[in-house]
Regions:
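PP2C/PPM-type serine/threonine phosphatase catalytic domain
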Residues: 1-161
Length: 161
């Protein structure tokens, strides 16, 4: 069965912060580390066979490095996807797990090299496989399903209380 995915996305710094600590990775597109978001709503269409992956990152600052953490995760996903797209076809859950490990390692390595103790990013990701969609999230970036005119949260927050 062939299906297609219509999608739209945007990214905006908001009115409070001078810099944008968010980023995304949408079928190979992501923003540079220093950005003010997108100026438009971007749209696209992908066939299931192309195994599209989409992710959002919400950088956490501490030492004004939230934008770097979000970019590092996006950039890491870009390289991981290119090198491991075959894994997504054969073992999508393993792909998501390994992608998350890879992104986390990139952020941790940078923080260690730069002696930054408080930097990180949350993440929500969806990958479309042959017959199913696979989701994962880290932190409090949420994934919702829209069905029959209603949104319902399908991810679970990972936060300390």
């Amino acid at each position: 069965m062939t299906y297609h995915i219509d999608y739209a996305y945007t990214c905006h710094a908001g009115k409070v912060r001078p810099n944008n600590e968010d980023n995304f990775w949408c079928c190979g597109e992501y923003l540079p580390v220093s950005n003010h978001g997108t100026e438009e709503i971007r749209t696209g269409l992908r066939l299931r066979e192309s195994l599209p992956v989409m992710s959002v990152f919400d950088g956490m600052g501490g030492e004004s490095q939230g934008e770097m953490a979000a970019w590092l995760a996006s950039d890491s996903l870009e390289h991981f996807y290119r090198e491991n797209k075959g894994m997504l076809r054969k073992a999508p859950e393993l792909f998501l797990t390994e992608a998350c490990k890879n992104m986390n390692q990139a952020v941790c390595d940078y923080g260690r090299e730069q002696r930054i103790s408080a930097m990180g990013t949350t993440m929500a990701m969806i990958a479309f496989g042959k017959k199913e969609a696979y989701i994962c999230n880290l932190g409090d970036s949420r994934i919702y399903r829209f069905s029959k005119g209603n949104f319902s949260q399908i991810s679970r927050d990972h936060v300390l209380k």
